[in-house]
From Swiss-Prot:
Name of this chain's protein: Uridylate kinase
Reaction catalyzed: UMP + ATP = UDP + ADP
Pathway per the UniProt entry: Pyrimidine metabolism; CTP biosynthesis via de novo pathway; UDP from UMP (UMPK route): step 1/1
SUPFAM superfamilies (UniProt xref): Carbamate kinase-like (SSF53633)
Record-stated family: Belongs to the UMP kinase family.
Residues given in the record as ATP binding sites: 11-14, 54, 58, 161, 167, 170
HAMAP family given in the database record: PyrH_B (MF_01220_B)
């Protein structure tokens, strides 16, 4: 079965791991995500993952409540490592070799982030999960995803969310909101469509890395994305606005 990509970076929000629980990690949701990733790995596609931590702790929210912003962001980084280790466990229990690499040294728990080692793991068919964000406060995990994608030469970023693409307005508030099939980086930035934060979009634009935004809750969508099926919204430099 042919695939459209050789190496992809999958961006998972922390919220994607909590399902309908409202907080924390839903083991069944993580299991389903792991099974989808295993199916994609079986096609020969290399997968790296950046996972958020918003299901456990949100640094921006804590900072707005009075916590020191840098401290809040570091706590959020630790939350991403908890999610990374949970996903690693779920993947390895179904036979998918997985390595967690963290931007902050946690030698008893994970490898340090080393670009060449990460690429070597991918070449050997292992999943690599990047935890602890970029290791720096004031940067989002979306920006980390763009940075890591550029570093490992990923061909695309899959941003798996709870909505089925990018809309011109919040579809939960405006039922008639229009979903885009494709967008340019410039339009996303000009219209502040919040596909990712502006730093992440700028990094993707500079390095010509397309972003596919799609619904993770629909079973099989990761595989569909890899096969090039028409799902979600594609953001890129040469995309038409439609």
């Amino acid at each position: 079965m042919g695939t459209n990509y050789r190496r992809v970076l999958l961006k998972l929000s922390g919220e994607a791991l909590m399902g309908n629980m409202g907080y924390g990690i839903d083991p069944e949701v993580v299991k389903e995500i792991a099974q989808e990733i295993a199916e994609v790995i079986a096609t020969g596609v290399q997968i790296a993952i950046v996972v958020g931590g918003g299901n456990i702790f949100r640094g921006v929210k804590a900072a707005s409540a009075g916590m020191d912003r840098a401290t809040a962001d570091y706590i959020g980084m630790i939350a991403t490592v908890m999610n990374a280790m949970t996903l690693q466990d779920s993947l390895e229990r179904i036979g998918v070799q997985t390595r967690v690499q963290t931007a902050i040294a946690m030698q008893e728990l994970a490898e340090p982030y080393i670009r060449r080692r990460a690429i070597r793991h991918l070449e050997k068919g292992r999943v690599v999960i990047f935890g602890a964000g970029s290791g720096n406060p004031f940067f989002t995990t979306d920006t980390t995803a763009a940075l890591r994608a550029a570093e490992i030469d990923a061909e695309v970023i899959f941003k798996a969310t709870k909505v089925d693409g990018v809309y011109d307005a919040d579809p939960e508030v405006y039922p008639n909101a229009k979903r885009y099939n494709s967008l340019t980086y410039a339009h996303v930035l000009a219209q502040d469509l919040r596909v990712m934060d502006s730093t992440a979009i700028a990094l993707c634009k500079e390095n010509n890395i397309p972003i596919l935004v799609f619904d993770l809750t629909t079973r099989g969508n990761i595989r569909r994305a890899v096969l090039g099926e028409s799902i979600g919204t594609l953001v890129g430099g040469s995309c038409e606005i439609s």
